[in-house]
Amino acid sequence: MSADNVSSIDPEKERISRERREKLAKWRAKKALMDSQNELKKETVPLEVKNSKITNNENDSTSRSKLLERQHKLQEWKRKKREREEEQLIKEQENTKETSSHSKKKNKKQNRGSQKRQITFDDSDDETTGESKDSFDKSEIVVEKSDMSGSKNNNEDDPLEAYMKSLVNGGQPLNHKIGENILDEDGDDNSIEEDDEFSNSESDEESSRYKRISKAKAKKKVKEIKFTIKDLEPFPKSFYSEPDEVKLMTDDEVEEMRLSLGGIKVKGKHCPKLITRWSQLGLPTDIMNLITKELKYDEPTAIQSQAIPAIMSGRDLIGISKTGSGKTISYILPMLRQIKAQRTLSKNETGPLGLILAPTRELALQINEEVEKFTKQDRSIRTICCTGGSEMKKQINDLKRGVEIVVATPGRLIDILTLNSGKLISTKRITFVVMDEADRLFDMGFEPQITQIMKTVRPDKQCVLFSATFPNKLRSFAARILTDPLTVTINSNNLVNENVNQSFYIEDNENDKFNRLVNILDGFYKVNKNITSNSEEREIDEEVSDKKIIIFVSSQQFCDLLYSKLENFGYFPYTIHAGKPYQERVMNLEKFKTTTNSILLCTEVLSRGLNVPEVSLVIIYNAAKTFAQYVHTTGRTARGTHKGDAITLLLPDELAAAYILKRALRERELSSIDPQMVEDMKQMSERFESGMKEGKYKLSKGFGGKGLDNLDTKREEKQQEEKHKLDKIENDESTPSTSYKTTDNASSSSEVDSVTIPKLEFTIDRDKNIDSTISFTAIVNVNDLPQLVRWEATKNTTLMFIKHETGCSITNKGKYYPEGKGPTSNKDQPKLYLQIEGKEEKDVLLSIELLEQKVREGIKKVEYQSIKSTKY
């Protein structure tokens, strides 16, 4: 390269460098402007948030000091940045002058020493001479590379120009690394990155982290709706008008009729009289034909005769009846009547108007099928079944089009209510809520989900609970949710269906029990085969030909094991348990329903709600451990007007099951069983009863579950067991006085049971709040109670229990004064008391009732301690 060429390049290079400096200055000015705008936005948002916090708490000096410190650091950063920019501009001007002289020397040296290869500016980094390293610093090499690469290939986009274009377009920089390569002068770019990181990282990372946490928490949480009178669209509830023949019935005749229908017991005020015929309900002709001709329900069952008039009168109801008694129709007919009387859904409304909650998928699908029988001819009422394990996309599309009735499990309904920030469906028009198998809903731990759902429904709704049992936990929930409910109980002393013939066998070991199972199956199908051997007779009586069997076992593993053993004997049952995929469970259940003389092997997952009328035999292979479980398991046969058998297979050590059988079996059933086996069963039952009196055994009262409540129960049981062992050791150490101590313990127990429990002194005041809402406050005096009782009533676990059960606020107030002392002036604190606050008076009264239960437990502890201390 000649000297003339070098001299011609130098002015061109100087021009390019000048243009780049101008672009660089413009870019920095633009970046400084954008940074200041971003910082201003970030300052205003935290300032608004901070101001809102300050209005709530004016003493939040810590937050204010942090804000001022941040603003001070930001101003300091801007000042340093301006100083760096000025220094850098001066340095660039000096470097520009040196660049021309250095490039001349460099080009001459390259022409003399590198004739074997052509040198380009892309190869300048490969030179190893000391002069080149000393002559150029890093910034000059980078600039020269970028300049020459630009001249070498004009088609390539300049990185700085691309970066400037992205800023002009309002976007973010394309790549931060490009900016680093171009502007890596004296560490300026690093300082800018550090300052940017300082200004953005703290707030951005912290806010994003809190957003993620809050979003995860709120993901499955339904927002409570605060209703006002203006928001509530009025709707009719009462549609029932007593016919003349019912009106003329006297109270004695009504009681006699209730006894004749299975011992109907009614609790509550102003309950309508029961009906005896469908025509007394005033149903439309098409519904009457469906009930009497298609469904072949000639007359109402016991629960239907009393529950339907009560619900159609607009009352909240708790229905307690045996399984297979027709509870589903008891709430379907009133729900359809109420929905038909309301305004139809508009184009912008999704519904629903009626909501039915069920504990399991199978029961929800079954209820939906029953509802569709009544709505298939009526296009104005649309239904949908929302359960887990099924495709949600189709459910969402159906819900968007609008539905009048939703049948769902609580978990899937929570998922739907939280979709799209709760905007998918609206619960404002729900006026009728049903909880079927309510006790099972609570046993499975759905109470929190149901409580969330009920907070989104209008308070003047009509709510109905149906169940086969009514435990205390469900009772307290019903007191919170239902308004002045009626309780209808059908034959509460004997919940086993009258159409079920019960029997049992006691076997010595598992092998004998399995052989007994095979003999039962062989005998059953042999008899059934003889009955249906004639094909013409089979066509005439199809019900006799299809005899299905359900075998209940205790666990998934045992279910699979028993299936393998039965398969070796030529039986191929369909198996269903929670360990199988949902689609396989549905398919096996459908095959069981459609296949003649089929066998179903399952766990207790299907002990409730399964309705297959052709089931004529239920075999309880692993004996039920609770009475409720036995009731529901035997209820899978003898559905409606059909008859069926229930056989229990026992082992000698299953004492609890023998105790349940003794209470459940009727005299006519005992007379048909081997007398020796009946005697063995009674002895096992007596052993269990005596063990319960001694504290050795305890009969379970529910299906169990997990959670804190169950852990507390287990802990108490363990403590009682350890206490029993300790008492037994004490008795063994003093054998001469064993008989005396037994008598003493009996008398002690009677003394404790005969303790009179004092009623708590309390007053309830009605308060009107600033926002015109009404609240109730109760003052309960606990100062004068015995010490242990006072501790029991005021300890934290008691207060948290009451708050959880009732939703009321309960706090300790005042000061404890010994007996005979009290406050002497108005300045002194009052005697120790509990203050209970709630929105409803019934919630406050329920809190006091639960508190009295805790006081009763405390009184018994006091008496027991005093008796035990004076025993010796």
Swiss-Prot record:
Motif Q motif: positions: 276-305
Feature: compositional bias, Polar residues: 734-752
UniProt biased composition (Basic and acidic residues): 10-21, 61-101, 130-147, 709-731
Enzyme's top EC category: hydrolase
EC number of the protein: 3.6.4.13
Reaction catalysed by this enzyme: ATP + H2O = ADP + phosphate + H(+)
GO molecular function, one term: RNA helicase activity
Comp. bias (Acidic residues): 182-205
Region described as Disordered: spans on this chain: 1-21, 34-213, 708-752
Superkingdom of source: Eukaryota
Swiss-Prot/TrEMBL keywords: ATP-binding, Helicase, Hydrolase, mRNA processing, mRNA splicing, Nucleotide-binding, Nucleus
Compartments, record wording: Nucleus
GO cellular component, one term: nucleus
Basic residues bias (residue ranges): 102-115
Domain Helicase ATP-binding: 308-488
Binding site for ATP: 321-328
First-listed, main subcellular location of the protein, grouped into a coarse class: nucleus
Motif interval(s): DEAD box: 436-439
InterPro entries: DEAD/DEAH_box_helicase_dom (IPR011545), Helicase_ATP-bd (IPR014001), Helicase_C-like (IPR001650), P-loop_NTPase (IPR027417), PRP5/DDX46/KHDC4_KH (IPR056149), RNA-helicase_DEAD-box_CS (IPR000629), RNA_helicase_DEAD_Q_motif (IPR014014)
Domain notes: The Q motif is unique to and characteristic of the DEAD box family of RNA helicases and controls ATP binding and hydrolysis.
Function: ATP-dependent RNA helicase involved spliceosome assembly and in nuclear splicing. Catalyzes an ATP-dependent conformational change of U2 snRNP. Bridges U1 and U2 snRNPs and enables stable U2 snRNP association with intron RNA.
Family statement drawn from the similarity comment of this UniProt entry: Belongs to the DEAD box helicase family. DDX46/PRP5 subfamily.
Protein name: Pre-mRNA-processing ATP-dependent RNA helicase PRP5
Taxonomy of the source species: Eukaryota, Fungi, Dikarya, Ascomycota, Saccharomycotina
